[in-house]
Amino acid sequence: MDDEVLKSITLSSIEERYTELSSSIVLTPSVKLTSPFLIYLIKASQIYLKLECFQYSGTFKARGALSVAKQIPEEEKKFGITAASAGNHAIAAAWAAKVENL
């Protein structure tokens, strides 16, 4: 990411994107990790896990894929999207394409 892109990311832009995606993204739960060994190993007082496995695509990558798909100009949507992945990103990209009718 170049500096211009990074400078354009503001709290307001994050909140806008959250609102834009919220109707299509699952609000997944977080659970507190109760393993004393891992808490000791990581040197943390508390650790929470975000259960993104409950997301429609089974991964947090759905957020990014849908965010990008929503930014595709209308006249370019007829070309669809391509994802170079054999894993979570490809699954999320396919899901985002379906949601956005690409």
Task: List the model feature ranges, each with a label.
Residues 1-102:
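PLP-dependent amino-acid enzyme catalytic core
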